[in-house]
Amino acid sequence: MWKPNEAGAASTLNTTAGDYALFVDALLNGKGLKPETLREMETPQVAIDPACRICTKQEPKELSKNLFWGLGWGIQRNDGRDALWHWGDNGSFKAFVMAEPKSKSGVVMFTNSQKGLEVAKPVVDEAMGEESLMFDWVK
């Protein structure tokens, strides 16, 4: 397995889908974090501009009423349900995770394909029982 020489904010997480699922399970069940820390992570901090993924040089055109960033997680609000989500993109490897704290359910998906996120939406929608709103933005 490739191992980076230095840790970074992106692209240096090396794990398996099973181990990452254990991490998500611990998060959903409040293990390893103070309750107030977990609440803060799950609270929308910034609304997403659906028209712009990397918006450092322009003002937002419109802010989403359903997609936000919490602390370290994307947050989707859909029909009164909040779900946490995140994705990884290392070129030819893609990953996606979605978890719903209220129902304590989630899905972790790792692929070894540049087109891995193309199959993620139907898998995530089926597993979570709701439409995933962020895939148009993630692309």
For each predicted feature, which ranges?
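Catalytic loop of the DD-peptidase/beta-lactamase superfamily, centered on the K-T-G motif
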Residues: 1-139
